[in-house]
């Protein structure tokens, strides 16, 4: 009996494919059942984060046919939405990102839907902004964020510039499943779409409005012009170079050294296998350059410039990486103190963080009289809180949102994390502390002295292959069927299961949070984009060593469960 995946493979092999890279790849795997099964037994699933997969031939890979199919599904949904019948598109520096962006534009144009596409790579915040600026029905960002070079992806956005809602994504997925991957999508060439006036480039007016929206969120305007901040910046061969340097120069930062090997777009990411500003390897070249130049600060943005990581210069001249939680707390503290001082703090201010981000932020928010809301993981839930404030005519109350995974936003002009404003505010904050004879390191130590030494660490456990998802499901179910009563000798005093919305007041999510008798917390959840289970630890100690020792005890106790 010939399996269905074998038949699908044969169909692709015999088709007249319009991508020269795919045919040799298909011929090469002839007779290799395991490889054919991996590529054709399943299709990439379209969810609220869109698509993400390895580049290559097959239904379980990212290629022009999977992009056409996904875009036809999106187009079918857009046609039911009325409005402008317009979709905004942007893309990052990844391999084939520009090709996939133009492919999506061709499908939309063939469906009589207008397209606004950037004429060169631009980051996530630029896509979110254009979606709102042109009052689009949807937006598409071609990116796989900080995954290795062999990946690409396709993020879909709703009309508010927020990643697509579960309901809309479910309808799009249904439409995708009705569309034959090779022949089902309507299509015209990009050139034809431009000629017919269906495809237009994003105008300079939109780009300028984005920069103005970001720069209007400075806490102490003009400060950077005289503070003399010395900066090293790396776009990690991604889309951050133009927007980040433009905004930093606009606010008065002149001394910017770009890491030369990581300056220009390069989808092969030859300097680091994982272009992720959360990890040391991605920041290593920048750190070396910071040491050489004596920079006050080193910044790195990921390929789609929605996350930013930093290293700060300490008073003793050494450099220290700063976690996403620490940067989030530093920014919250800086924005609150600065806006109170300048008289620009709104009445009843609101900040938002994800449930896995540090509780230290709660203590800081309380100190400044700010309402801090905790939402599910995924920046769209922070965007959703902004939308709720907007609907009530109170959008000015929103001052800041962050996730521990290096995502920040300090205004309602976009609805996704924005490494451009993150970079601007981090630089302004560093410049301010420099101008008063302090530093980021000193301020962070003062915060710990005031509120306690919190340590936040994440461990990831990988579950590769087709069976990986099943193992992850079984593991999470096991934690529910046989609940833990203690971890490393600490009694569990409260378990919050986010699959029970009636208990949390939030939409259902596959997340378990354990609160221990000493005030520490452990969060267990599967990753939304990778075959991993993540465990987040928040421990508290008199000093860093004590907090780290606590974390190690908890991690050792949980390791056997993840085996």
For each feature predicted by the language model, list its residue ranges.
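Phosphate-binding and adjacent anionic-ligand microenvironments
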Residues: 291, 295-297, 318, 338-525, ...
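Gly/Ser/Thr-enriched, mixed-charge loops and adjacent short helices
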Residues: 35-40, 44, 152-285, 289-290
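N-terminal small/polar loop signature for handling phosphorylated ligands or for N-terminal nucleophile
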Residues: 88-151, 249-309
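An N-terminal, well-structured beta->alpha segment
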Residues: 4-104, 111, 194, 199-227, ...
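Conserved phosphate/anionic-ligand binding catalytic regions in large, soluble enzymes, centered on
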Residues: 40-60, 144-145, 231, 235-247, ...
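Short acidic, glycine/serine/threonine-rich loops at helix termini
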Residues: 98-103, 128-132, 150-156, 177, ...
């Amino acid at each position: 009996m010939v399996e269905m995946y074998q038949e699908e493979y044969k169909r692709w092999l015999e088709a007249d494919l319009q991508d020269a890279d795919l045919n040799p790849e298909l011929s090469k795997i002839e007779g290799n059942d395991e490889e054919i099964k991996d590529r054709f037994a399943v299709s990439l699933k379209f969810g609220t984060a869109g698509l993400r997969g390895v580049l290559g031939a097959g239904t379980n890979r990212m290629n022009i046919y999977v992009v056409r199919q996904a875009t036809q599904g999106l187009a079918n949904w857009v046609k039911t939405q009325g409005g402008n019948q317009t979709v905004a598109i942007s893309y990052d520096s990844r391999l084939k990102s520009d090709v996939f962006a133009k492919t999506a534009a061709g499908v939309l144009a063939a469906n009589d839907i207008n397209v606004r596409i950037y004429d060169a790579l631009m980051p996530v915040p630029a896509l979110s902004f254009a979606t709102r600026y042109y009052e689009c029905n949807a937006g598409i960002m071609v990116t796989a964020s900080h995954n290795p070079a062999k990946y690409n992806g396709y993020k879909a956005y709703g009309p508010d510039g927020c990643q697509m809602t579960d309901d809309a994504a479910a309808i799009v997925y249904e439409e995708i499943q009705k569309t034959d991957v090779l022949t089902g999508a309507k299509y015209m060439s990009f050139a034809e779409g431009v000629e017919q006036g269906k495809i237009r480039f994003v105008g300079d007016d939109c780009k300028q409005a984005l920069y103005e929206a970001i720069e209007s969120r400075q806490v102490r305007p003009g400060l950077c012009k005289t503070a003399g901040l010395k900066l090293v910046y790396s776009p990690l061969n991604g889309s951050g170079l133009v927007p980040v340097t433009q905004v930093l120069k606009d606010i008065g930062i002149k001394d910017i050294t770009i890491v030369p090997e990581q300056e220009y777009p390069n989808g092969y990411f030859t300097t680091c296998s994982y272009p992720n500003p959360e990890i040391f390897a991605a920041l290593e070249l920048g750190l070396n350059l910071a040491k050489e130049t004596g920079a006050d600060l080193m910044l790195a943005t990921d390929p789609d410039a929605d996350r930013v990581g930093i290293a700060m210069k300490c008073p003793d001249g050494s450099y220290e990486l700063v976690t996403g939680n620490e940067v989030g707390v530093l920014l919250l503290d800086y924005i609150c103190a600065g806006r109170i001082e300048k008289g620009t703090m709104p009445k009843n201010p609101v900040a938002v963080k994800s449930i896995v981000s540090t509780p230290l932020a709660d203590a800081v928010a309380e100190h400044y009289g700010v309402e801090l809301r905790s939402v599910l993981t995924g920046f769209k839930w922070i965007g959703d809180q902004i939308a709720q404030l907007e609907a009530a005519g109170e959008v000015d109350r929103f001052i800041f949102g962050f996730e521990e995974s290096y995502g920040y936003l300090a205004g309602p002009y976009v609805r996704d994390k924005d490494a451009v404003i993150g970079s601007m505010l981090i630089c302004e904050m560093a410049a301010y502390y420099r101008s008063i004879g302090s530093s980021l390191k000193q301020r962070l130590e003062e915060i710990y002295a005031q509120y306690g030494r919190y340590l936040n660490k994440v461990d990831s456990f990988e579950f590769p292959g087709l069976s990986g998802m099943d193992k992850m499901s079984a593991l999470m179910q096991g934690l529910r069927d046989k609940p833990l009563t203690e971890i490393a000798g600490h009694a569990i005093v409260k378990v919050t299961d986010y699959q029970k919305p009636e208990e949390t007041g939030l939409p259902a999510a596959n997340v378990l949070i354990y609160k221990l008798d000493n005030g520490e917390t452990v969060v267990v959840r599967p990753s939304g984009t990778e075959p991993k289970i993540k465990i987040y630890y928040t421990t508290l100690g008199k000093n860093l060593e004590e907090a780290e020792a606590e974390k190690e005890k908890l991690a050792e106790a949980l390791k056997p469960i993840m085996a």
